[in-house]
Amino acid sequence: MKERIRRFVARLEIDDVGFAAASDYRSPLSPPLESIFPGARSIVVLAYKELDSCDSPDAHIAMNGRMDLMEFSRSCNYKLARHLERSFGARAMTVPVSYPMAQNEETKATVGQVSLRHAAAAAGLGAFGSNNLVVHPRFGCRTVFTAILTDLEIPSDPPVVENPCTACGLCVQGCPGKALDEPGRTDVMKCVKTNMPYGLSGAIRFWGKYGEVSATERKAMVRDPNFWRLYQAGHIGPQYFCFACMNVCPVGRVATT
């Protein structure tokens, strides 16, 4: 069964695939798989190598590369889920690569229904690095993961024995938001403040100030590029403006598929 799935994944030109039994998946913050998919037995995890767009000094080009990857991965997720249903008679559900995710007091909108990092580690696709991303043995942390939940019973792939992360510390030192200063933990709020300046917090600050100033100042505010960036973010969705912890990582920089 695994080999049939691997061959299908290869035809989609996905870079890697791993399998994890539901019992081997453990996430400290995401809800139990049973609450999402009663009867889920396995997770099929797909790995995609980032384009070199993430190296661009132009944040918009870097983010465009990520958006291209996300669009491609959504299509692949759906195609593989359909393949599992039609070829194996299985039930299958796709997991969001990013949004939508639960919005509630407990998670503060920063926790996905399935932790793709923990799923990838359980599926033998890498191990956690100093930047708290999963480092793939070939592609390093320049890897995006997606997943499909299924009721097929598929045994887990062997875990990565030797962590690809070299613990060089470049990601910790290079984080402009100082979000990685505490070992083993990412300060999400510090990361978001730097990484997503035109997200929800940026919009709250803008409109809070907008309501307090004069009509003349309001006109100036909506003519400022800051407002245009907020408008663009509201139109196309969350945008990342920092890829530092990926860019400085030496693991997999010259890897090929």
Set out the residue ranges of the language-model regions.
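Non-catalytic, usually N-terminal nucleic-acid engagement modules in DNA/RNA processing proteins
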Residues: 1-75
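Catalytic cores of enzyme domains
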Residues: 68-257
